[in-house]
């Protein structure tokens, strides 16, 4: 393992074969972005494409404009510590960085990120992240109670809504270009998909 120094303290970069908690995560000084999924390190993909970032900007602007002071909207990188009720956040083994998250409970906001499930998460698929976004991360969002998950497919020009009902995600009809997405969790929130995928 490689050693790196921060001020007067020497910290080892994490062993990729180990299992860790948030307590370990916040002690690392590694420069690259990473997530913890079931205690295992998952490195973030290299810098996203221009198209990916344009969609982040468009959807982020729509969400920010809609929610204003009612909820907070954050793009990645934003650490989301997925914790169960009464669980010490430092003991969680699941820390993710959604492309966009919406948090309506101010009690979940912390200097380090979000402590608990956001109300709405947006994940934008790319070749390097699709398997993780559609697999373990989706399952974690379901387990920890993210009310609504948007899976954006830039190549197909679609958004799939996953709505949490009785602890399980129900996949709603897919929205495509020419359609207007309406959030079931936030009925006043509508998104024109032609605007989202204008350059795709």
Q: Positions of the model-derived regions?
A:
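Gly/Pro/Ser/Thr-rich low-complexity, intrinsically disordered segments predominantly at protein N-termini
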Residues: 1-200
